[in-house]
């Protein structure tokens, strides 16, 4: 996906640091692949302007926490560019329900009535999928097409140019992608994936949300407010909405 294509633009602070990667041959090949799939009638999610929504919502210097996902939701109207998040009005996916359960158990915060995580992103939580597109009804359809190299570069750049970030690595895929992170410079918290298949193996009870805030406070930074406003009070003017 070339950065200048159509309406798709990378947020300026990210463009300055990782935009060069979008000019590489493998990204031109990815862009051609996406055009071919759309021409063949495939429905690609999220919509083009939302592919880079995670970067729009959380500029480079504002990142405090990184949550790594795998690839976007593949159901109608679900994916909007932030990992684990869905737009208001879309049923909350099972993995996110388990995230909410852990937040409630960890911090006493009641489960919200939606799955829209933009308020976290605005506070500095980069909600980054390893693969930024998918096709309707075909989980993982765009894996190994070029996105992973770009998002690896994003993680490597954060690791190198920032200090004291918290990386939340849930599941073996995220943990493998996070192997490059220097744990003497950053806090890395690992747990099984919040999927119903694995959450009971250690995600539930991991206390990652309170541990994240403890780390931020120790560094003199404001903690993340993991609570979410009710759906009726959401601000839907930002990227991805």
From Swiss-Prot:
Major localization class: cytoplasm
UniProt enzyme class: hydrolase
GO cellular component assignments: cytoplasm
Any single biological process term in GO: base-excision repair, AP site formation via deaminated base removal
PROSITE patterns according to UniProt: U_DNA_GLYCOSYLASE
Top-level taxon of origin: Bacteria
EC numbers on record: 3.2.2.27
Annotated GO MF terms: uracil DNA N-glycosylase activity
Pfam families recorded: UDG
Subcellular location field: Cytoplasm
Catalytic activity field: Hydrolyzes single-stranded DNA or mismatched double-stranded DNA and polynucleotides, releasing free uracil
SMART domains per record: UDG (SM00986), UreE_C (SM00987)
Entry keywords, A to Z: Cytoplasm, DNA damage, DNA repair, Hydrolase
Location of the active site: 71
Entry's family note: Belongs to the uracil-DNA glycosylase (UDG) superfamily. UNG family.
Function: Excises uracil residues from the DNA which can arise as a result of misincorporation of dUMP residues by DNA polymerase or due to deamination of cytosine.
Stated name of the protein: Uracil-DNA glycosylase
Originating species: Xanthomonas axonopodis pv. citri (strain 306)
Taxonomic lineage from the root: Bacteria, Pseudomonadati, Pseudomonadota, Gammaproteobacteria, Lysobacterales
Gene: ung
């Amino acid at each position: 996906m070339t950065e200048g294509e159509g309406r798709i633009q990378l947020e300026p602070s990210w463009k300055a640091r990782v935009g060069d990667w979008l000019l590489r041959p493998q990204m031109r090949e990815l862009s051609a692949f996406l055009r071919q799939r759309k021409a063949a009638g495939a429905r690609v999610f999220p919509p083009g302007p939302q592919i880079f929504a995670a970067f729009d919502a959380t500029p480079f210097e504002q990142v405090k926490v990184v949550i790594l996902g795998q690839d976007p939701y593949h159901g109608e109207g679900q994916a909007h560019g932030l990992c684990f998040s869905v737009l208001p009005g879309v049923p909350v996916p099972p993995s996110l329900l388990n995230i909410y359960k852990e937040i409630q158990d960890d911090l006493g915060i009641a489960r919200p009535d939606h799955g829209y995580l933009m308020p976290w992103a605005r506070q500095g939580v980069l909600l980054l999928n390893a693969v930024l597109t998918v096709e309707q009804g075909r989980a993982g359809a765009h894996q190994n097409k070029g996105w992973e190299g770009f998002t690896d570069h994003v993680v490597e750049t954060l690791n190198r140019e920032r200090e004291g970030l918290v990386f939340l690595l849930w599941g073996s895929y995220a943990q493998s992608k996070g192997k490059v992170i220097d744990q003497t410079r950053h806090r890395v918290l690992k747990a099984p994936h919040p999927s119903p298949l694995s959450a009971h193996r250690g995600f539930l009870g991991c206390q990652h949300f309170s541990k994240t805030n403890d780390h931020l406070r120790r560094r003199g930074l404001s903690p993340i407010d993991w609570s979410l406003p009710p759906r009726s009070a959401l601000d839907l003017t930002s990227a991805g909405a």
